[in-house]
Amino acid sequence: MWAGVFYNDEDPINGKVVGSRGHTKGVLAFDLGTNSAFWLIQSTPNFPPAGSYSFPKSGMANAQTLLCITLQDASVAQALAKQMFAAQQPNVYLASRIPVDLTNQTNDPRVLLMQDHVAQGNTPLSAVIPFFSKGRTKFMCMAKNASWGLDFYNDLVGPTLHDDLDVETWEHDPTPPPLDSDKIHTVVDMKGINL
């Protein structure tokens, strides 16, 4: 029995972004019969059109990323879905597939992701889930909700990785100065790279 959840931070009907939802896009799919799963994380704007393929013009101005991870098993997909449901509350594409047998399991976070009407809690939340791919590559999934109120890179990613970070972020305001809230690791928001 397989299922797939297509999610995005934009509303699939009107294309508007809801500010309280996580800036997150992708596909989380799993097969309980074979105990397998994959996670496609991507940054391309807009939901893909149903039944066809097109790359949005809005995605051509900036670089886009796509990363597909074959997960170790379906339980990893369940843990990732639980974090997504709690922290990011993505919009779920109507073309997602959840079998009837699973929709009766209302405590399964993979099914809860389909219940797009559930309001995100106001309790501040950040979470880190270490996991392995099927090929034994180690990953960490880090997430926060809108109520957390701290800087994602300076207060979660840098301290979790115990390292300085050079990041390129989506800028709507002037470039912030380097941050060092833990007095150990510095986060610098880059403007460009010379090769």
Question: For the regions a protein language model found, what residue spans apply to each?
Answer:
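PLD/PLD-like phosphodiesterase catalytic module centered on the HKD motif
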Residues: 1-195
